[in-house]
């Protein structure tokens, strides 16, 4: 791999197991000259155990048009919505509260997301989760 030159990094958010050549995936990969169906098949195979989760993926495209990709944990907002069974956050987060997140839920989300965050301490990750929850109109106990 060291002799291949990286020509592009593509960052997308794709539902697990549901990659297809339609926008936004097709145009982003097509512009880089990547085999779109090859990526879709590999991504779907790698994420078939996480259906429906919105997964950030970083695709590295090399000069010979090959690629590698790394999937990350879902965004904190998606994890919060999943924990509280919400469709979306509040449209007016300072006035309308749409749910309440317990400290146990905050800790579980922070532990799950910690490897993708640039933090060392669990407390720092918990504060980031709490901030995201507040910006979505969710109270934190």
Curated annotation (Swiss-Prot):
PROSITE patterns linked: RIBOSOMAL_L11
Post-translational modification: One or more lysine residues are methylated.
GO molecular function, a single term: large ribosomal subunit rRNA binding
Gene Ontology CC terms, in alphabetical order: cytosolic large ribosomal subunit
GO BP term, example: translation
Keywords: Methylation, Ribonucleoprotein, Ribosomal protein, RNA-binding, rRNA-binding
Signal sequence region: none
Pfam families: Ribosomal_L11, Ribosomal_L11_N
Function field: Forms part of the ribosomal stalk which helps the ribosome interact with GTP-bound translation factors.
Assembly with partners or alone: Part of the ribosomal stalk of the 50S ribosomal subunit. Interacts with L10 and the large rRNA to form the base of the stalk. L10 forms an elongated spine to which L12 dimers bind in a sequential fashion forming a multimeric L10(L12)X complex.
Protein family per UniProt: Belongs to the universal ribosomal protein uL11 family.
HAMAP family, per the entry: Ribosomal_uL11
UniProt name for this protein: Large ribosomal subunit protein uL11
Gene name for this UniProt entry: rplK
């Amino acid at each position: 791999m060291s002799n291949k030159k990286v020509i592009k990094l593509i960052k997308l958010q794709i539902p697990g197991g549901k990659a297809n050549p339609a926008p936004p995936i097709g145009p982003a990969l097509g512009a880089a000259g990547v085999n779109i169906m090859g990526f879709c098949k590999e991504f779907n195979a790698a994420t078939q155990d996480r259906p429906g989760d919105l997964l950030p993926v970083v695709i590295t495209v090399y000069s010979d048009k090959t690629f590698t990709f790394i999937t990350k944990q879902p965004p904190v907002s998606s994890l919060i919505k999943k924990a509280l069974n919400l469709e979306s956050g509040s449209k007016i987060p300072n006035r309308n509260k749409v749910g309440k997140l317990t400290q146990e839920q905050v800790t579980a989300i922070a532990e799950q997301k910690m490897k993708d965050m640039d933090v060392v301490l669990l407390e720092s990750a918990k504060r980031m989760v709490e901030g995201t929850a507040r910006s979505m109109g969710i109270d934190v106990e």
